[in-house]
């Protein structure tokens, strides 16, 4: 019986209705309802307001990864250098040691100071031999042969020490750019190397070809091996030979009085002679 008696049917208590709603909420969702919800969820991913930011973010991540791999990836030593770099790319780094008159080691610093090298705490260049071990690239200067220092029981050539001392003073602790030609059999990279110096008269910061500078000072000869010679092009080879010719004419370095010295021996002749003697 309704109470009060004058109340309408629409004003009846809804206890039964509430029970029915509660039971309905406990029933499992039908397949049609699930499919409909899934369709609604996927539709959100196809909207422009979702697609455009996602596309921008993905492109940015992939571009950053490619840029890092191409320009900011550091090579710890010569064997680790990607083959795609040879004859196409260069590396930038700081010279940590000079082993001979025509080879030295650099710590690869891709991007240089712009990438934070020697500015950020986690991009410091090691100084100790232990930290630098297996962490530097061994570079062989392209296109030249310097007199040999005494090693492996072999005697020292005339002007070997002068060539080594000059190269050390010219490059040690300086930043250089090496244009890579190829690896050699001694786990080095043959490269044309350039350096910029602040106190370079008459033009400061002028880019200098290290091999060329050694040739014109008479501290090296043009590389004369029958195979494996690397110059970086015919124009550079001609430039090197011209520099050697003038050094001979002026009597610079090792060429001083070489015409009168019957015992004069070029670095290539020295290596050939010593190699034949060791085979005996």
Swiss-Prot record:
Residues 89-257 form the TNase-like domain. It is found in: Mitochondrion; Membrane. Its EC number is 3.1.-.-. The active site is at residues 140, 148, 188. The chain crosses the membrane at residues 50-67. One of its GO terms (cellular component) is membrane. The keyword Nuclease applies. Keywords: Calcium, Endonuclease, Hydrolase, Membrane, Metal-binding, Mitochondrion, Nuclease, Transmembrane, Transmembrane helix. Ca(2+) binds at residue 145. It is a single-pass membrane protein. One of its GO terms (molecular function) is metal ion binding. The keyword Manganese does not apply. It is an enzyme of class 3 (hydrolase). SUPFAM superfamilies: Staphylococcal nuclease. InterPro entries: SNase_OB-fold_sf, Staphylococal_nuclease_OB-fold. Pfam families: SNase. Belongs to the LCL3 family. This is Probable endonuclease lcl3. It comes from Emericella nidulans (strain FGSC A4 / ATCC 38163 / CBS 112.46 / NRRL 194 / M139) (Aspergillus nidulans).
């Amino acid at each position: 019986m309704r109470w009060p008696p004058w109340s309408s049917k629409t004003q009846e208590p809804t206890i039964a209705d509430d029970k029915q709603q509660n039971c309905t909420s406990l029933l499992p969702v039908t397949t049609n309802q699930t499919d409909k919800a899934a369709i609604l969820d996927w539709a959100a991913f196809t909207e422009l307001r979702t697609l455009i930011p996602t596309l921008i973010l993905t492109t940015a991540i992939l571009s950053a990864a490619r840029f890092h791999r191409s320009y900011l990836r550091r090579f710890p030593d010569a064997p680790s250098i990607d083959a795609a770099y040879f004859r196409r790319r260069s590396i930038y780094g700081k010279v940590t040691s000079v082993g001979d008159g025509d080879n030295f080691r650099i710590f690869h610093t891709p991007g240089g100071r712009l990438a934070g090298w020697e500015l950020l705490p986690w991009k410091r260049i090691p100084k100790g031999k232990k930290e630098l071990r297996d962490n530097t690239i061994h570079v062989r200067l392209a296109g030249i042969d310097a007199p040999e220092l005494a090693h492996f029981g072999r005697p020292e050539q005339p002007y070997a020490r002068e060539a080594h001392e000059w190269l050390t003073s010219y490059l040690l602790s300086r930043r250089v750019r090496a244009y890579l030609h190829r690896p050699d059999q001694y786990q080095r990279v043959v490269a044309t190397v350039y350096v910029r110096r602040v106190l370079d008269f008459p033009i400061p910061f002028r880019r200098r070809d290290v091999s060329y500078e050694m040739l014109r000072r008479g501290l090296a000869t043009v590389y004369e091996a029958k195979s494996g010679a690397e110059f970086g092009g015919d124009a550079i080879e001609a430039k090197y030979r011209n520099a050697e010719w003038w050094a001979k004419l002026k009597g610079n370095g090792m060429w001083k009085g070489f015409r009168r010295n019957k015992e004069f021996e070029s670095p290539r002749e020295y290596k050939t002679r010593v190699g034949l003697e060791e085979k005996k």
